Amino acid sequence: MGGTSTDVSLVVNNKPAVSSETEIEYSMPVHVPMVDVRTIGAGGGSIAKINEAGLLEVGPESSGSDPGPICYGNGGKNPTISDANFLLGRLNPESLNIKENIKIKEDTKSILENEISKKLKLNNYQSAEAILKIANNKMANAIRMVSISVGEDPREFNLFSFGGAGPMHACELARELDIPKVFIPARPGLTNALGCLVADLRQDFTQTLNISLEETNIKKLHSILEKFKSDGVS
């Protein structure tokens, strides 16, 4: 879980699930083998708002890193998941390098009250809890999507939670899904970068042939495979 989204994937016997077809933004299909990751708009900067029906929504819009959540003190004007965690005492102001802690906390309370609490007739702490509950439900559904939908039981897995915001939500997700154990790395915000450094390098070669099976030319197929082999070892 980062600033704009949460990415979820299933790892079975130390092997991540791989999909031959994945959708990226705007539902664009990509027919390239890649790790099967489901992405939802629930990150630390995801904006909480009241929709036209008068219901509380969280994401997919994000405040980004600039100005970012209100609690960053950079002029953010929209309540976010991070602001909810901040008001509930789950974020250390010192770790955010907040110099005017009291003023920023009052700004966060004021904006949350005007944008959310008054409209829902709740106090700020109830609103913050509601924001986190909606975010956690979205993340729990994403975990169900990569596990239950493919015949796996999340109760038989452990939850490995990382990203700058992930560990703050891990225990609630584990309780919701009856996941027995939660693992949090020493530096969760750096885990993605570390993964890029230590992961095995892999290359996949694919080519589309728009011909019927009856028209398939074995020699042509062999020539394509030989080219793949040549490209792979070069």
What label would you give each PLM region?
Residues G2-S234:
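N-terminally biased helix-coil "hinge/interface" segments that flank
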